[in-house]
Amino acid sequence: MRVMINGFGRIGRTVLRAWLKGGWPGLQITAINDIAPAETCAYLLEYDSVFGPLDGVSLESDTLVVQGHRLPLTHVADISSLDLTGVDLVLECTGKAGTIDVASRGLRAGALRVLISGPSEAAEATLVLGANDHLLRPGMQIISNASCTTNALAPLARLLDEAFGITTGWMTTIHCYTGSQPTVDAPRSTDPARNRAAALSMVPTTTSAGLLLDRVLPDLAGHIDCAAVRVPTASVSAVDLCVLPARPLTAEAVNAVLRAAGGVIGVTEKPLVSSDLRARPESIIMALPETRVTGGGLIRVFGWYDNEWGFSCRMLDMALRISEAPA
């Protein structure tokens, strides 16, 4: 499958870094589009403040050469002006594909399908690996890969619901700051708190994960609500999930279910901190020592997720799944 990356920001660059490490032999990244100059694209790929330097990066005019791969760069705001004939899938990583007009630009340029790295009202389906990816159908052209937090929460919620039933629940994501937040106090968001300096405070705010969870797992719609606290760290976030099960359980029984999960759900028995989970490929890594069950039967589980690296791996995984479904 021939893949183009549109938007070479945090997710676009991390997708490329993850792809270079291998594991997706059926995918061939062939081109990149970003409005930034070629020199900036190359520099930010080579030197990353979170993941460190990347060897083998050079620039030949508007061709990015990375570890032997030659990737032509274009710099247009609207990719419908490009000729994308021969591109099987556009990884839409601009963060701006919420409408059908923007989301379909790759299709109008000749690409066969589009996978969006975030929520979008234009998507024919919002799919999460390990939760509802079985709903992928031939002929789907615009697909949303949901969000990093939804990719962490949805497989976990499905697992727990199938194991013992979820009556109701609450999830708080403890989320590192992102590019949507200012580095100094500035009017950036309709949420007043998100306008405060990202690296100086914990910021209570909203998350799209609750809405997206209802789309991904409609049987749980209205059963789990969500909130977020943005914290002054640069990478790795956490899901703190409390649920009331349909029947009484022990912490040991819950952890047995988590240990047996596999797939995109990892586990750790160690007392780790967020920086220990950097560049982990799983959608979520459950911290088993943090599992609690109250006398009233409420279950609390806690899991880490690298909101950039893990989600980028899911973008590549979903691209591979899409390649198996005829256009």
What are these regions (language model features)?
Residues 1-195, 317, 325-326:
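N-terminal Rossmann-like NAD(P) cofactor-binding subdomain of oxidoreductases
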Residues 2-4, 143-144, 239-245, 299-305:
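Short glycine-rich or small-residue beta-strand-to-loop segments that form or flank ligand, phosphate
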Residues 17, 21-82, 167-168, 173-299:
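C-terminal substrate-binding/catalytic lobe of Rossmann-fold NAD(P)-dependent oxidoreductases
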Residues 95, 148, 205, 246, ...:
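Structured loop/turn residues at secondary-structure junctions
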Residues 97, 151, 248-249, 310:
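A generic structural signal for alpha-helix starts
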Residues 162, 219, 247, 260, ...:
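Short, well-ordered loop/turn and helix-capping segments at boundaries between secondary-structure elements
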Residues 281-327:
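NAD(P)-dependent Rossmann-like dehydrogenase/reductase catalytic/cofactor-binding core
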